[in-house]
Amino acid sequence: MITTEIKRVKNHINGEWVESTGTEVEAVPNPATGKIIAYVPLSPKEDVEKAVEAAKAAFETWSKVPVPNRSRNLYKYLQLLQENKDELAKIITLENGKTLTDATGEVQRGIEAVELATSTPNLMMGQALPNIASGIDGSIWRYPIGVVAGITPFNFPMMIPLWMFPLAIACGNTFVLKTSERTPLLAERLVELFYEAGFPKGVLNLVQGGKDVVNSILENKDIQAVSFVGSEPVARYVYETGTKHGKRVQALAGAKNHAIVMPDCNLEKTVQGVIGSAFASSGERCMACSVVAVVDEIADEFIDVLVAETKKLKVGDGFNEDNYVGPLIRESHKERVLGYINSGVADGATLLVDGRKINEEVGEGYFVGATIFDGVNQEMKIWQDEIFAPVLSIVRVKDLEEGIKLTNQSKFANGAVIYTSNGKHAQTFRDNIDAGMIGVNVNVPAPMAFFAFAGNKASFFGDLGTNGTDGVQFYTRKKVVTERWF
């Protein structure tokens, strides 16, 4: 339940809420007002070790619980999430800043991930082939791997943790969760509801904190696998450090998602799609559209409509249903984003919509409005870097081939979209674009939870993505059995 009092956040270890053994804390402000709403502990290594010990002890019994019984617990958890979805959305808006509409959408996507986890009995089924030789049968069995950990970002404080621990736990593992210290309140509520669903103590443990918690997770010998979502430099570090310590690691990283706009697109729907992809959630998502490659033939018309519609967007507190763009997560991030806008101007791009100029009525929050640049090229930082904000760059290209070439020159390859009514264009795009997730007239090509989620190149470090059968394979190990009976 949301209150006005400043909350002191705790860890959850072995079924109990406990104070961190450390003394260092970090203030958690409401991004829309700057007012402090909580203090989160920056837990030391000792807290991680206690959480791992609890998870390791719980694994001995939880891994032996029949798979259907594990799923029944998750059905109860799913029901509790559905019953509390309005409260969960409000917590997200309070501590993350995204609009209540965006937060409600995130809650639904998180619930869908838990729905996937409830189907684990089907997803964990192995394979069998009788009589591979005279009197000999062969089969593959899947087993849990032990204690696993998840490190999640601030931008989707519900959806991304729910990509991880429900599926891992359904597969018979136990879990140590480290969510972003910027959004600790939603993590607390997720854990509360988890134990209301009747799970045994120690199956899920929550350790709040920063880099010390991350390093402790990566170095702990009893953690078998680590799931991570965050920025590219940190993802690279997590992957390299975790694998060096013998862990299975999936690290989902940054993005610079391109959308190619063809002359045969549906102009109205394309403009609205680009606006939604670029500016919803304040652009703080790894699937946001941050570059539009528009073909010359339609460029002027597309840009005129895009600019006119973007200027209608209201900026402000996410609890106000009239607002489309909420605050950024922190003042430091706001200053970083303003630096990118200034660099775009200095590099010669044309600033068509200036998000630095927003109504003073938004108050003391960390606001930057929707921003659009035209005349961008590959030498500019605003094209090269992940800005993670409502900043959209437009590059004019002569045709589809040039648009694909431009997109593939980015070091990132998370998502890519084409807007077209031509099936051949869509096919050419699909076959030649380098991206892990592709959309054809789909604004945000984030797949449903029963498909894998992962990018290519600097957008992903690892082999198996999150969700779907990839997720089950990541959280289990195979045993191949060849047997003969006399």
Swiss-Prot record:
It catalyses: 3-oxopropanoate + NAD(+) + CoA + H2O = hydrogencarbonate + acetyl-CoA + NADH + H(+); 2-methyl-3-oxopropanoate + NAD(+) + CoA + H2O = propanoyl-CoA + hydrogencarbonate + NADH + H(+). It is an enzyme of class 1 (oxidoreductase). NAD(+) binds at F154, K178, E181, R182, S231, E386. Homotetramer. GO terms for biological process: inositol catabolic process; thymine catabolic process; valine catabolic process. Belongs to the aldehyde dehydrogenase family. IolA subfamily. Pathway: Polyol metabolism; myo-inositol degradation into acetyl-CoA; acetyl-CoA from myo-inositol: step 7/7. The keyword Signal does not apply. Pfam families: Aldedh. Its EC number is 1.2.1.27. It comes from Bacillus cereus (strain B4264). This is Malonate-semialdehyde dehydrogenase. InterPro entries: Ald_DH/histidinol_DH, Ald_DH_C, Ald_DH_CS_CYS, Ald_DH_N, Aldehyde_DH_dom, MeMal-semiAld_DH, MSDH_GmP_bac. SUPFAM superfamilies: ALDH-like. Catalyzes the oxidation of malonate semialdehyde (MSA) and methylmalonate semialdehyde (MMSA) into acetyl-CoA and propanoyl-CoA, respectively. Is involved in a myo-inositol catabolic pathway. Bicarbonate, and not CO2, is the end-product of the enzymatic reaction. Keywords: NAD, Oxidoreductase. The gene is iolA.
